[in-house]
Amino acid sequence: MVHWTAEEKQLITGLWGKVNVADCGAEALARLLIVYPWTQRFFASFGNLSSPTAILGNPMVRAHGKKVLTSFGDAVKNLDNIKNTFAQLSELHCDKLHVDPENFRLLGDILIIVLAAHFTKDFTPDCQAAWQKLVRVVAHALARKYH
């Protein structure tokens, strides 16, 4: 079990309260698909992903990015039970979608970049450390069924 300090919890929940899930989720997923183009193979049904412009303008990328970040919000609400919170999603991504678990880490790193860009003043080194810890815990929870 992961131990969260009161300060870490406050930094995470405080910033999360300011996040526009639709915008940040869309940006994070779009960046994943652009920066790591091999991840596009999991989104073949999304249509045109042929260029950064196409990806950024793709409504399915935007909708799924919102869905992903909404799920991430479940981690913020359940900091003390992230492993169980993501048990079903881990199973889905492992057994049905066959997503490489390394992609969870990549998306977490991209989320850090998006948050830093959107919340420059609030995203202090302490805040970044708390969020880095969170994205690692979420990535580990999502990869759990792979072990």
Swiss-Prot record:
> What is one cellular component GO term in this UniProt entry?
hemoglobin complex
Keyword match Acetylation: no
Expression tissues: Red blood cells.
Question: Per its record, what are the GO molecular function terms?
Answer: haptoglobin binding; heme binding; metal ion binding; organic acid binding; oxygen binding; oxygen carrier activity; peroxidase activity
UniProt-listed InterPro entries: Globin (IPR000971), Globin-like_sf (IPR009050), Globin/Proto (IPR012292), Hemoglobin_b (IPR002337), Hemoglobin_oxygen_transport (IPR050056)
Top-level taxon of the source organism: Eukaryota
In this chain, heme b is annotated as bound at 64, 93
Coiled-coil positions are: none
Q: Name one GO biological process term.
A: hydrogen peroxide catabolic process
> What this chain does, per the record?
Involved in oxygen transport from the lung to the various peripheral tissues.
Q: Which family does it belong to?
A: Belongs to the globin family.
Assembly, in brief, is: Heterotetramer of two alpha chains and two beta chains.
Q: What is this protein called?
A: Hemoglobin subunit beta
